[in-house]
Amino acid sequence: LNTFHFNSLAILLMAGISCHTTADSYGIFDARSLALGGTGVALGNVDTGHFYNPALTAFHQGHEDRTRDGSHSFHAVLSALSDGARTAADAIADDLEGRLSAAIDDLNEVPTPGAARTGINAARDLENAMRQLDGKDVNADGYLGYSISLPGDMEGGAFFVGSRFIGRGVSDIDNADFDLLQDYVEALEFVESGGTAGEEHPELRDDAGRFIDPSFRIQSSAAGTGLLLSELGVSAAKQYNLWGQDVAVGIAPKVVHLRVFDEDWRVVDGEFASIGDNRTEFYFNVDLGTAVTLADHWRVALAVKDLRSKTITTDIGDRIELQPRSRLGLAYISESLDVGLDAELDKTPDLQGTAARQDISLGTEYRLSTLALRLGFRHDLEGSVGDQFSAGLGWRFSHLLMDFSYIQGDGGEGVGLRLGWAY
């Protein structure tokens, strides 16, 4: 039997963006910001602030050789994984179609009641998984990278390299496939019972009397696009005193390698085939940011991510647009307690221009001697995604730095991890 079809469909749904996708977001690139609901434009610190506002690394006093505030950090963040994506991942891990294929092969070799029962169970499990996927949004957004923070005396910078993956989709399961699997269940029940239950369904057998591969008749399909954004860059920031206030400006030039997966998966002559293309683009982009500290504890910040827009038209006619995203941040920062609010200034259209998103994020952090406690909330003003609540811990022991976070909301969840070394 052809075991490629359903697993490939599930994999595509894990990595696809269909015509009904939700909008692209500003992005979450580290575990601390994930725990704070995505807040970071004003509330970011010298370790990871460059991801959200390159000006933030300038808010530091003393050279890193004396303060030991610089760090090497490895980041692994899955900021969004929908329930549909979990269902697809479980289906891939369980290899449901492979189980059905093996059961049918065994039955064709030795047609015993036990082999028929194994095939019945496999067909029902596959049907249940397809029903769970039918019409569900399948969304995933994650980041994997490495960074070095270089805080100086009223100035700073960072080096960063990493990849962000964005994938969204909606399955298109044909109802005829459910009928097909039910026919196989009835035919296998007929074999198991010796003809006293089920139905014979001779149309499911070839001229030699062997069961035909059901994958040749499956009609379900999926079409979509996935993005892999890989960046290598540096950030630089400088702090100035203007009219008695500390003002910082920063810039983060970067080289971007963009890979677009644009495919249309469907059955062609009995095989699950892809009609589409994978494209790559290599270009330069830049992030800009500024921040000002007021009355010692208040900070107002503005940042623009990916100043240069990018438009790609794929071979199957989809127009993908990556536009600049701007955010305003407000934070209260003290010795032990930080509270921050981020708001996107514009609606951000999705990659195919069919929906929009505009996030506001609220986060708070309370620091003890070696432990940081974090809570966050994220809301989309356009309603394209549901509200999310998050929490996390930060821990420092000597030079070792660790951050853990978890986020959950309407229809999905995410996790984040950072491992760092202070120097």
PLM region descriptions:
Residues L1-D30, L107, T112-A116, V191, ...:
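Cleavable N-terminal export/targeting peptides
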Residues C19-D172, W421-Y423:
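N-terminal, post-signal peptide beta-strand-biased segments of exported outer-membrane/organellar beta-barrel
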Residues A31, N139-Y143, L229-G233, E281-N285, ...:
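Transmembrane beta-barrel architecture of outer-membrane proteins
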Residues A55-A58, G145-P151, F160, G233-Q239, ...:
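Transmembrane beta-barrel domains of outer membrane proteins
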Residues A58-H72, I148-G156, Q239-A248, V260, ...:
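Short loop/turn motifs that connect adjacent beta-strands in outer-membrane beta-barrel proteins
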Residues A89, A122-V138, G167-L227, V256-F284, ...:
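Extracellular/periplasm-exposed beta-strand and loop segments of Gram-negative cell-envelope proteins
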Residues R164, N241, P253-V260, A295, ...:
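Short acidic/polar capping segments at secondary-structure boundaries
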Residues A291, H297-Y423:
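Outer membrane beta-barrel transmembrane domains
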